[in-house]
UniProtKB/Swiss-Prot annotation:
Any one GO biological process: photosynthesis
SUPFAM superfamilies per record: GroES-like, NAD(P)-binding Rossmann-fold domains
InterPro entries: ADH-like_N (IPR013154), BchC (IPR005903), GroES-like_sf (IPR011032), NAD(P)-bd_dom_sf (IPR036291)
Protein name: 2-desacetyl-2-hydroxyethyl bacteriochlorophyllide A dehydrogenase
Organism of origin: Rhodobacter capsulatus (strain ATCC BAA-309 / NBRC 16581 / SB1003)
């Protein structure tokens, strides 16, 4: 079995090609992908060639871990059947030396049924946003976690953090954004240039920007005993001046990727109408134009989220 895929053969080297797929086994699904998202976090680091080394990485690889599509084949005991629509957080199902480190940017995928999440087909392209929304939910969830009163960055993750804060019954957070073009689209909360915000007593600051060198600035905006949550991915060592953090008795927390419970909880919020994914997808390109799509996603500041459309791919 073969399928069309996006291949990242090195930094800034994106193409489409044909890849072999592993045979489905017991407990597996075969899914035809309709839409896949491009991550401006980890995928961008691979595209730039700046991803810190970790096990399993290397080129050539099939990128993408945000895919939505239709089940076309299901093993008997999976609980799924052809026609079901699911979110897939990537797959490692390729032959011929292609790394499936993420593996979601493909017309067809073979994956364990335990890894997917069933979705209403009416969700459309927004179905590819489930993992990103679940990542935002993961940062907020937990018995002792304070909801943010300041979010740094009004990209897709920052917007989801703000929407989830409101959905959880929290007070409208302040959001900082240095790019004027990204200060639009807020519903129920305010977006400001950091220089226009005089406040210095925030209780919980969530950094969704991933920008280096911000911690000292953010510590100065915390109140006594405040918490700083790092939601981005940082390629350089994270450091900060100790004395200001000591005086503030700052608490530091790092939020990593979603867990299965986050996917289920986020799906429930979407299905109930408590969380909207509207307005997050700003760009959409056919999968055949992947090279241009990746460049736009990573270099155009007006691009919040790029979606690849696989419906016409062979």
């Amino acid at each position: 079995m073969e399928t069309q895929v996006v291949i990242m053969s090195g930094p800034k080297a994106i193409s489409t090609g044909i890849a072999g797929l592993t045979d489905p086994g017991p407990g597996d699904l075969v899914v035809d992908i309709a839409y896949s998202g491009i991550s401006t976090g980890t995928e961008k680091l691979f595209w730039l060639g700046t991803m810190p080394p970790f096990p399993g990485m290397g080129y050539p690889l099939v990128p993408g871990y945000e895919s939505f599509g239709e089940v076309v084949q299901a093993a008997p005991d999976t609980g799924f059947r052809p026609g079901d629509h699911v979110f897939i957080p990537g797959a490692n199902c390729f032959t011929g030396g292609l790394r499936g480190l993420f593996g979601g940017a493909s017309k067809r995928l073979v994956t364990a049924a335990s890894r997917v999440c069933r979705l209403d087909p009416a969700i459309g392209p927004e179905g590819a946003l489930l993992a990103l929304a679940a990542t935002a939910r993961h940062a907020l969830a937990g018995f002792d976690n304070a909801l943010p009163d300041l979010i740094v960055g009004h990209g897709t993750l920052g917007r989801l953090l703000a929407r989830l804060t409101l959905a959880a019954g929290g007070k409208p957070p302040m959001v900082w954004e240095t790019n004027p073009a990204r200060r639009t689209g807020a519903v129920g909360y305010e977006v400001l240039d950091p220089e226009a915000d005089p406040r210095r007593d925030y209780k919980a600051i969530y950094d969704a920007s991933g920008a280096p060198g911000l911690i000292d600035q953010l510590v100065g905006r915390l109140g006594k005993g405040g918490e700083l949550v790092l939601c981005g991915f940082y390629t350089v060592p994270v450091s900060f001046a100790f004395v200001p953090a000591f005086m503030k008795e700052m608490r530091l927390r790092i939020a990593a990727e979603w867990q299965p419970a986050d996917l289920s909880a986020t799906r429930a919020l979407i299905e109930s109408g408590a969380l909207s994914l509207d307005g997050l997808i700003t760009h959409r390109r056919p999968a055949a134009e992947a090279a241009e799509a990746y460049q736009t996603a990573f270099e155009d500041p007006d691009c919040l989220k790029m979606i690849l459309d696989w419906k016409d791919a062979k």
